[in-house]
Amino acid sequence: MNFKYIVAVSFLIASAYARSEENDEQSLSQRDILEEESLREIRGIGAKILGGVKTALKGALKELASTYVNGKRTAEDHEVMKRLEAVMRDLDSLDYPEEAAERETRGFNQEEIANLFTKKEKRILGPVIGTIGNVLGGLLKNLG
């Protein structure tokens, strides 16, 4: 009788331990899934913000371009117009990152691709903002 009791208790302890190990593995995988979902949400929010900024910049640049097109242009104005056109092309290239990704990132893993796009956006948006500042400064100087 004592032997049967010892075997039964040992079996219960072993099954409880196995269930706790299984629950630990499930909670880890659920935690990983939740972390991945939160990262996707953060990326989605960032993409929406960046999209809004790009749309606003495009609108401002189109307005500036139409102002330059309708008036007489000096050589300096012509140079500024060329810069604006280049900035517009750069902003348009940000709208189709999938095509750029296929050409530029073959063989990279997902993290390297994300870092590449972040660097590319910084590389493009930095000069864009500088150019817009210069254009607005030039307009204010010409108007004043």
Swiss-Prot record:
The keyword Coiled coil does not apply. Keywords: Amidation, Amphibian defense peptide, Antibiotic, Antimicrobial, Cleavage on pair of basic residues, Cytolysis, Fungicide, Hemolysis, Secreted, Signal. Expressed by the skin glands. Its main location: secreted. The modification Asparagine amide is found at residue 70. The keyword Lyase does not apply. Pfam families: Bombinin. One of its GO terms (cellular component) is extracellular region. The modification Leucine amide is found at residue 143. It is found in: Secreted. Residues 19-43, 74-123 form a propeptide. One of its GO terms (biological process) is killing of cells of another organism. Maximin-7 shows antimicrobial activity against bacteria and against the fungus C.albicans. It has little hemolytic activity. Maximin-H6 shows antimicrobial activity against bacteria and against the fungus C.albicans. Shows strong hemolytic activity. Belongs to the bombinin family. This is Maximins 7/H6. It comes from Bombina maxima (Giant fire-bellied toad).
